[in-house]
UniProtKB/Swiss-Prot annotation:
Its EC number is 3.1.1.-. Its main location: other. Glycans are attached at residues 88, 110, 231, 436, 465, 515. GO terms for cellular component: extracellular exosome; extracellular region; lysosomal lumen. InterPro entries: PLipase_B-like, PLipase_B-like_dom1, PLipase_B-like_dom2, PLipase_B-like_dom3. This is Putative phospholipase B-like 2. Disulfide bonds join 142-152, 492-495. It is found in: Lysosome lumen. It comes from Homo sapiens (Human). Keywords: Disulfide bond, Glycoprotein, Hydrolase, Lipid degradation, Lipid metabolism, Lysosome, Signal. Pfam families: Phospholip_B. GO terms for biological process: phospholipid catabolic process.
Length: 589
């Protein structure tokens, strides 16, 4: 990856990190006796493989080697030809809003060693970003700053039981490709955490994952539903809060098929990394298995997170997979969220991306062991089935999957895509059975069309504006669209004032007045909105390339700036003050 160079602001950042760490450690000592084993402060970078006292470079490359005689993994700078795993990080966040991570493993070593080493080397090149992302987003979750003891103990017990059940399944099904991939996923996470903590030791046989360690960085989506299922009473999710917009668009004459996604999130999550993994994993645990179809992948992500979480993936199998969150508003369904018999969503999406070569297979793999957490509408685009300039193949180009607790519905939507020329996704289920079961009918009855599939603001804006998409640039413009002060479709009739920054393809809830009146929480002023856009095409996906812009939209509204915003007091380590970045083309050597 060739990117602009970026140097960390050494002394200022160091002071901020020192203050935050000191406070975290003091509070950890105060609350530790009351709530053992829960999350909180993690050590600042400076483990045995870190360069103590040095400002981290804008670009860093490292390799993990196997010392056969000593039976140990060793870290060296640069890319070594005999590496078990290697990684290169280019930090261009100050220039583009993105860091770029490229990571690969060697098929000369077994899958388990590759997976663990992949986690080890990722932490080694990105430890400063991991620390800052943790402090920005996770340090307050279940201590030491603030916590809800009953909920946190229930969450810890749930995760421990779930990890134990998965360990039992891995041991009971040693020949299973599915459980082989689950094990590799957890080993990669184990390597990431061990490396960051400076205690690398490849686990032979059974191994453990801390329930509230770096697992929390993977769980941000699953936690949205675990909080409700486990009766968290403080700081519940905002009713109606959007989480991503997506558009799949056939260009005129079926000349191309564009796939676009923007992530909606809290602005403290804007330390962003676009990652490329090239993992030489086999489908099953034995050497005669072929490589997984999705062994090459590019995805938008975050420091310390080994999957997308947005989610947006371009896969070497010819698939592009993405989702928007639909959630669950029916409390009666939380009974299906159980620690045993389920695999949490972040793991299932990794496994499906690796093993599937078409949409139907992806759906079959993903829906196994439905956890009922991180409930999403998934779109699986298969570019292998798309014929540029040709008629509809009838099937396989677009598969739609929707998950809620106790239910997964799948359908091929290729014919509908070709009939309408687009598929839009905006956090509302498209399947009537899912819509009704998830409790949205009651919200429509209470609040009107804002919660309906056809009448919500984004449904109407997509329907009106999708025909304006003629190429990559116009797709980016639509996905960054927010003209809430002038667009009648952005009005909230029950709000005062009526124009609302949430009612757009890329939300800017920070622009809503703090003293306004709003019928539900999502329409209020919040440090939340669309924080990126990613777009690919048939030709770009073939080479794992995309266009990407980072940060809240600033096309029709002022750019977001921390120092002048109502949220300047929120921790945002490592982030630029002013978010005003143009799209960049992401390509790889």
């Amino acid at each position: 990856m060739v990117g602009q160079m970026y140097c960390y602001p050494g002394s200022h950042l160091a002071r901020a990190l020192t203050r935050a760490l000191a406070l975290a450690l003091v509070l950890a000592l105060l609350v530790g006796p009351f709530l053992s084993g829960l999350a909180g402060a993690i050590p600042a970078p400076g483990g045995r493989w870190a360069r103590d006292g040095q400002v981290p470079p804008a670009s860093r490359s490292r390799s993990v080697l196997l010392d056969v005689s000593a039976g140990q993994l060793l870290m060296v700078d640069g890319r070594h030809p005999d590496a078990v795993a290697w990684a290169n990080l280019t930090n261009a966040i100050r220039e583009t809003g993105w860091a770029f991570l490229e990571l690969g493993t060697s098929g000369q070593y077994n899958d388990s060693l590759q997976a663990y080493a992949a986690g080890v080397v990722e932490a080694a090149v990105s430890e400063e970003l991991i620390y800052m992302h943790w402090m920005n987003t996770v340090v307050n979750y279940c201590g030491p700053f603030e916590y809800e003891v009953g909920y946190c103990e229930r969450l810890k017990s749930f995760l421990e039981a779930n990890l134990e059940w998965m360990q039992e399944e891995m041991e009971s099904n040693p020949d299973s490709p599915y459980w082989h991939q689950v094990r590799l996923t957890l080993l990669q996470l184990k390597g990431l955490e061990d490396s960051y903590e400076g205690r690398v030791s490849f686990p032979a046989g059974k191994f453990t994952i801390k329930p509230l360690g770096f697992l929390l960085l993977q769980l941000s989506g699953d936690l949205e539903d675990l909080e409700l299922a486990l009766n968290k009473t403080k700081i519940k999710p905002s009713l109606g809060s959007g989480s991503c917009s997506a558009l799949i668009k056939l260009l005129p004459g079926q000349s191309d098929l564009l796939v676009a996604h923007n992530t909606w999130n809290n602005y403290q999550h804007m330390l962003r990394v676009i990652k490329k993994y090239w993992l030489q994993f086999r489908e099953g645990p034995w050497g005669d298995y072929p490589l997984v179809p999705g062994n090459k992948l590019v995805f938008s992500s975050y420091p310390g997170t080994i999957f997308s979480c947005d989610d947006f993936y371009i896969l070497g199998s010819g698939l592009v997979t993405l989702e928007t969150t639909i959630g669950n508003k029916n409390p009666a369904l939380w009974k299906y969220v159980r620690p045993r018999g389920c695999v949490l969503e972040w793991v299932r999406n990794i496994v499906a991306n690796r093993l599937a070569s078409d949409g139907a297979t992806w759906a079959d793999i993903f829906k196994r062991f439905n956890s009922g957490t991180y409930n999403n509408q998934w779109m699986i685009v298969d570019y292998k089935a798309f014929i540029p300039g040709g008629p509809s193949p009838g099937s396989r180009v677009l598969t739609i999957l929707e998950q809620i607790p106790g239910m997964v519905v799948v359908a091929d939507k290729t014919s509908e895509l070709y009939q309408k020329t687009y598929w839009a996704s905006y956090n509302i289920p498209s399947f009537e059975t899912v819509f009704n079961a998830s409790g949205l009918q009651a919200l429509v009855a209470q609040y009107g069309d804002w919660f309906s599939y056809d009448g919500s603001p984004r449904a109407q804006i997509f329907r009106r504006n999708q025909s304006l998409v003629q190429d990559m640039d116009s797709m980016v413009r639509l996905m960054r669209y927010n003209d809430f002060l002038h667009d009648p479709l952005s009005l909230c009739k029950a709000c005062n004032p009526q124009p609302n920054g949430e009612n757009a393809i890329s939300a800017r809830s920070d622009l809503n007045p703090a003293n306004g009146s709003y019928p539900f929480q999502a329409l209020r002023q919040r440090s939340h909105g669309g924080i990126d856009v990613k777009v690919t095409s048939m030709s770009l996906a073939r080479i794992l390339s995309l266009l990407a812009a980072s940060g809240p939209t600033w096309d029709q509204v002022p750019p977001f700036q921390w120092s002048t915003s109502p949220f300047s007091g929120l921790l945002h380590m490592g982030q630029p003050d002013l978010w005003k970045f143009a799209p960049v083309k992401v390509s790889w050597d």
